[in-house]
């Protein structure tokens, strides 16, 4: 049994990482490693009571027990009147291709833990200024297995709809029953995490409308929400501007080469909808880099993440349902199934300060309803 919250002292870590001596890609890897090691040693306990959260899973086994502190990256000290429930992206990557590797990461899988803890700093931290950020660990599908399922079926639904969704559902039950205390909330994720957020929106909140009505917004970033999704699940609404509430906010970021070649991108699905994270429009109105309040990028010389200007403009490309940018950044997503110039890994960081401001704006709009 745990008390809400378990705090991981990650606020501000990105501003005080030690300087690293390596150059190039090795330095990038060291930055992520440093982020992870900082988070690993930062656990401490604070206050809120809870009961056991072990539940029978939809797939027939036992979901993860979220009454155990080891099941959470963070249950924060409550200092805000709005929460964020964040689901991290695929971190079980390289080791998932090893011979005999399981399809799903165990909760103590070192590669997954490091990736999740690093992603807290680069992505989930954007919600810290306005909300209490909750982040569960979950048994996620490995990159190898997700790729195999996608090859067979055309999507990764079968990979995430069992074990992974069972864990997220159990984590949500624990959160709402023991830690939320009736506060409004945001749910957010990236990549595989966002695909799970979609499952939550489509299924969990349909089963729990009393919880859904307190949702400020859902940030389904780095995975597609499509027109078909909205037709099939009429209780879902996509954002139409910068301050509507109870809505889905989503985009996938690409460079001009992906668009020019009409390249296949695993997260850009047919019928996808993206909102422009600079001007918050759904049409193809161009937003110049001058509207970008700051990107959150690694400084390879200093060995830390910092707010900077990389010329990250944004424009919706309606025929692909993505955002295209001319950002001055030479590190597109490595996996070939994202296309030659996808900025999948930078969906949050390119538009970090605009997203932070948008979170505050939607919360203010929710309060004034």
Task: Kindly label every feature range from the protein language model.
Residues 3-27:
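Short, Lys/Arg-enriched N-terminal segments with co-localized hydrophobic residues
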Residues 27-35:
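Bacterial N-terminal signal peptides that target proteins for export
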Residues 46-47:
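C-terminal motif of bacterial Sec signal peptides marking the signal peptidase cleavage site
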Residues 51-113:
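N-terminal low-complexity, Ser/Thr- and acidic-residue-enriched intrinsically disordered segments
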Residues 88-183, 327-369:
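Active-site catalytic motif of lipid deacylating hydrolases and related acyltransferases
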Residues 166-181, 203-352, 356-365, 369:
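Surface cap/lid and interfacial helix-loop subdomains adjacent to catalytic sites
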Residues 189, 193:
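Gly/Ala-rich beta-loop-alpha elbow adjacent to hydrolase catalytic centers
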Residues 196-200:
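Hydrolases whose catalytic domains are alpha/beta-hydrolase-1, hotdog thioesterase
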């Amino acid at each position: 049994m745990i008390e809400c919250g378990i705090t991981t002292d990650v606020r501000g870590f990105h501003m005080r990482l030690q300087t690293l001596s390596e150059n190039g890609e090795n330095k990038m890897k060291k930055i992520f490693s440093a982020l992870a090691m900082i988070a690993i040693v930062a656990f401490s306990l604070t206050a809120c009571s809870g009961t056991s959260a072990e539940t029978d899973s939809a797939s027939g086994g036992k979901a993860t027990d979220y009454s155990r502190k080891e099941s959470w990256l963070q249950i924060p000290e409550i200092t805000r009147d709005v929460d964020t429930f964040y689901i991290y992206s695929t971190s079980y990557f390289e080791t998932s291709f090893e011979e005999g590797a399981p399809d799903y990461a165990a909760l103590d899988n070192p590669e997954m833990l490091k990736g999740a803890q690093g992603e807290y700093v680069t992505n989930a931290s954007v919600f810290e200024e306005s909300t209490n950020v909750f982040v569960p660990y979950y048994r996620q599908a490995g990159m190898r297995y997700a790729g195999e399922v996608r090859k067979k079926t055309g999507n990764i639904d079968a990979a995430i709809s069992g074990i992974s969704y069972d864990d997220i559902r159990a984590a949500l039950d624990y959160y709402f029953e023991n830690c939320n205390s009736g506060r409004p909330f945001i749910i957010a994720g990236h990549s595989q995490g966002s695909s799970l957020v979609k499952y939550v929106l489509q299924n969990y909140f349909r089963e729990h409308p009393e919880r859904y009505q307190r949702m400020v917004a859902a940030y389904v970033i780095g995975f597609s929400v499509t027109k078909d999704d909205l037709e099939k699940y009429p209780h879902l609404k996509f954002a139409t501007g910068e301050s509507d509430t109870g809505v889905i906010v989503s985009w996938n970021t690409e460079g001009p080469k992906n668009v020019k070649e009409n390249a296949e991108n695993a997260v850009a699905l047919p019928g996808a909808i993206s909102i422009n994270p600079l001007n918050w429009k759904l049409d193809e109105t161009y937003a110049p880099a001058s509207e970008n309040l700051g990107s959150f990028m690694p400084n390879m010389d200093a060995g830390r993440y910092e707010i900077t200007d990389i010329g990250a403009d944004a424009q919706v490309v309606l025929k692909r349902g993505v955002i295209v940018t001319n950002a001055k950044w030479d590190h597109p997503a490595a996996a070939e199934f994202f296309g030659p110039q996808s900025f999948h890994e930078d969906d949050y960081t390119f538009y970090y300060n605009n997203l932070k401001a948008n979170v505050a704006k939607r919360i203010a709009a929710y309060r004034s309803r």
